[in-house]
């Protein structure tokens, strides 16, 4: 099996991630923050170390690293925790439904209004798009760092600076960039990311980084193991946002994944871009194939394509039968497909352990599928 769906979740994970998950299941680890016995303290050291490793990747402070279930959970915490009735929100054409659905739900209930920022023909957003769309009640700007459909990377530092020029806080969806692109000094007020994609941790992990200038309302309240004399949710971080037992085995794996990308992240990005550019050149040479996204724009290891006159689901299915795991469809990004003018695409997304031979075989398989109708 050739796995090329790393944008959905990464596979394989580094061996130390697997060992860490198993280690927590096989030895006595207690509930982190609950109890003063050795097993609970040992568990607390794992969560502390993971917060530190992630904070280092972000150039942030550990207590502002909030563990979530996935990136969707982190985005919901930020969006629904921060917005108030009457707010106006800026969003982008490349937003995933993890951003769009919470926003569209609030809009449908009449609580907020939304504007989509204008993008250039290459899919990039310029800082002027923010000044054009801003309104007196604009309370949040949600940016997607890298598209999960085309892999195009937005100039987020310039966009965040532009939003801050109007006093607007920014939530950055780093689902497709965390682990490969540098997330230090982006200026984002909140960063949402999965632990199970580029950070190479297990499914069931995500992070919301909450910066100093924002304080979303917690969506989940309950026991934190701290301030137990009070029936009210504590204000201290990260406890304010982390009620209930954490997913310790998965967090132990995420710690190892975060350490791995801390050492290799830049090289991983270079390698993944090399592989995806190789695939782009191969596919671009086949007249029946349309490849989407600007090959010159900054990018991550994600590429979408279609075959003339064929449904993307059919192509993904034919590839699956040949042993390739690629995703066909809308990739939960309907606005992006409206912008591209597509009904869906086939998506290949590489990881640090993908190989050139796999990319060559995929190119061969697509060339064969084009021949056979
Ligand atoms: C850009 C983007 N945002 C958010 C998400 C949601 O991530 P998760 O599956 O961890 O909830 C994804 C998932 O593919 C994504 O690509």
Where on the chain are the PLM-derived regions?
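Pyridoxal 5′-phosphate
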Residues: 1-373
